């Protein structure tokens, strides 16, 4: 149980690695962590020197330069809902001034029980995250 979707991004910064640490990743190979590009797999982050070509992603989601997409996909887990993106499944009014419509996205920033999902929401899929965060100029790899 844990992280479910390997991915990589065409950048590698200390700030981005710190955000991954905040999600629960650890450095897999400290000798490669400063390479040009950054990837995640299982609970590890690691640097890669050459990016995968979109047609050769080998199970990794190619996030281009899109940091929001990379972090959203890297956050996907099967043991928690924390820091995961959710999609609204039915129109409803949460409170005065806050209404949700089918298809709205929201980031869960509250630690919660994994089994305690609100009835109007479901976890976003990889394809939905790509569509939500995509930059029309980028070519992304989806399997």
Feature locations, PLM:
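Charged interaction segments
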Residues: 23, 31-143
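Short, extreme N-terminal segment that most often corresponds to the first beta-strand
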Residues: 1-28, 143
């Amino acid at each position: 149980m844990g992280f479910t979707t390997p991915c990589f991004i065409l950048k590698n910064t200390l700030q981005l690695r710190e955000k991954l640490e905040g999600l629960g990743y650890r450095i897999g190979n400290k000798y490669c962590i400063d390479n040009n590009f950054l990837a995640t797999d299982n609970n590890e982050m690691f640097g890669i020197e050459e990016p995968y070509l979109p047609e050769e992603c080998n199970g990794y989601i190619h996030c281009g330069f899109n940091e929001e997409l990379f972090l959203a996909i890297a956050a996907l887990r099967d043991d928690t809902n924390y820091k995961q993106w959710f999609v609204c499944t039915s129109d409803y009014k949460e409170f005065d001034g806050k209404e949700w419509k089918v298809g709205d996205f929201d980031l869960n920033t509250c630690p919660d029980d994994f089994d305690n999902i609100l009835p109007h929401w479901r976890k976003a899929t990889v394809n939905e995250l790509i569509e939500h965060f995509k930059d029309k100029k980028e070519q992304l790899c989806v399997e």
